Swiss-Prot record:
<comment type="similarity">
    <text>Belongs to the GCKR-like family. MurNAc-6-P etherase subfamily.</text>
</comment>
<dbReference type="GO" id="GO:0046348">
    <property type="term" value="P:amino sugar catabolic process"/>
</dbReference>
<dbReference type="InterPro" id="IPR005488">
    <property type="entry name" value="Etherase_MurQ"/>
</dbReference>
<dbReference type="GO" id="GO:0016835">
    <property type="term" value="F:carbon-oxygen lyase activity"/>
</dbReference>
<feature type="active site" description="Proton donor">
    <location>
        <position position="90"/>
    </location>
</feature>
<dbReference type="GO" id="GO:0097367">
    <property type="term" value="F:carbohydrate derivative binding"/>
</dbReference>
<dbReference type="InterPro" id="IPR046348">
    <property type="entry name" value="SIS_dom_sf"/>
</dbReference>
<keyword id="KW-0456">Lyase</keyword>
<comment type="pathway">
    <text>Amino-sugar metabolism; 1,6-anhydro-N-acetylmuramate degradation.</text>
</comment>
<dbReference type="GO" id="GO:0009254">
    <property type="term" value="P:peptidoglycan turnover"/>
</dbReference>
<dbReference type="InterPro" id="IPR001347">
    <property type="entry name" value="SIS_dom"/>
</dbReference>
<dbReference type="GO" id="GO:0097175">
    <property type="term" value="P:1,6-anhydro-N-acetyl-beta-muramic acid catabolic process"/>
</dbReference>
<feature type="active site">
    <location>
        <position position="121"/>
    </location>
</feature>
<dbReference type="GO" id="GO:0016803">
    <property type="term" value="F:ether hydrolase activity"/>
</dbReference>
<dbReference type="Pfam" id="PF22645">
    <property type="entry name" value="GKRP_SIS_N"/>
</dbReference>
<comment type="subunit">
    <text>Homodimer.</text>
</comment>
<dbReference type="InterPro" id="IPR005486">
    <property type="entry name" value="Glucokinase_regulatory_CS"/>
</dbReference>
Length: 307
């Protein structure tokens, strides 16, 4: 693409427009600057609210994928890629899902998490090759993340995903973007011009983070990773999380700290199992079987085995 063509393309993007509400921001005090930023940030949840039906559609597709052994895969460059990697990396400790069930891919690879990798996002073939390298299948869901909706790395990845029958989702912050027209589901929260012109790590990045939070959290809730609003599948891998596990058992059952600690010791810190045993009085082996019979849904296991 020529420089003139690129300039023309950027001129059409809402995310590249100048914000009339922040034209004087370089004249303001520190407090006034952060107030102005905060004012703009208030626009983000409203923009996300407009696309909740599309987010819910994507959640349903992710749940369907998980149920047949498929994966959720994020694909992005720069800030968009980093946000995908961040969200994916939180899933194993939060929900005790295996590494690789949710994957974040970023143009330029791991080095791009800390450093700008020049040109990595400009090659559509790299998006395809990164998906090939993880063995993408038709059971997977690929979420292409790009504020502009025109990042070649993401376009190439989504095109490949579509070609093999994987579910495709586009997350951008410009209406009718290139990736939005490509994907099966388009999620396009339009937050308007940034506080600093073109700095899409700001409002656009915040909108993306909110949507990614929803995709994984809602999907994990739907496959039984919570009980009420408690993270009952949390992996107790450090002192803080061991304490959290005890607290969750106490909150779910009303038992004391000593009892929670005792039952967690019996279950090797499996919170779901500890709660089921505490509420029903079942032996460990029977409780484990009951939980399996309920498909991992703790509420169902409790209801089926209450005295």
């Amino acid at each position: 693409m020529t420089e003139q063509a690129l300039l023309s393309e950027l001129d059409r993007l809402v995310s590249e427009e100048r914000n009339p509400r922040t034209m004087d921001i370089d004249l303001l005090s520190s407090l006034a600057i952060v107030r102005r930023i905060n004012d703009e940030d208030h626009l983000v949840p409203a923009a996300v609210e407009q696309v909740l039906p599309q987010v819910a559609q994507a959640v349903d597709k992710v749940v369907d994928a998980f149920r047949v052994g498929g994966r959720l895969i994020y694909l992005g460059a720069g800030t968009s890629g980093r946000l995908g990697v961040l969200d994916a990396s939180e899933c194993p400790p939060t929900f005790s899902v295996p590494e690789g069930m949710v994957i974040g891919l970023i143009a330029g690879g791991v080095d791009a998490l800390q450093h700008a990798i020049e040109g990595a996002e400009d090659d559509p073939s790299l998006g395809e090759s990164d998906l090939r390298n993880i063995g993408l299948t038709s059971h997977d869901v690929v979420v292409g993340i790009a504020v502009s909706g025109r990042t070649p790395y993401v376009i190439g990845g989504l095109a490949y995903a579509e070609s093999i029958g994987a579910t495709t989702v586009a997350l951008s912050c410009n209406p009718d973007s290139t990736i939005a027209t490509m994907a099966e589901i388009a999620i396009s929260p339009v937050v308007g011009p940034e506080i600093l012109t073109g700095s899409t790590r700001l409002k656009s990045g915040t909108a993306q983070k909110l949507v990614l939070n929803m995709l994984t959290t809602a999907s994990m809730i739907r496959i039984g990773k919570t009980y009420e609003n408690l993270m009952v599948d949390v992996s107790a891998t450090n002192n803080k999380l061991v304490a959290r596990a005890s607290r969750i058992v106490m909150q779910a059952t009303g038992c004391g700290a000593g009892e929670a600690k005792r039952v967690l010791a019996l279950t090797d810190n499996e919170v779901k199992l500890a709660i089921l045993i505490t509420i029903t009085g079942m032996p460990v082996d029977e409780a484990r079987k009951a939980l399996k019979n309920a498909g991992g849904f703790l509420r169902q296991a409790i209801n089926a085995n209450k005295a």
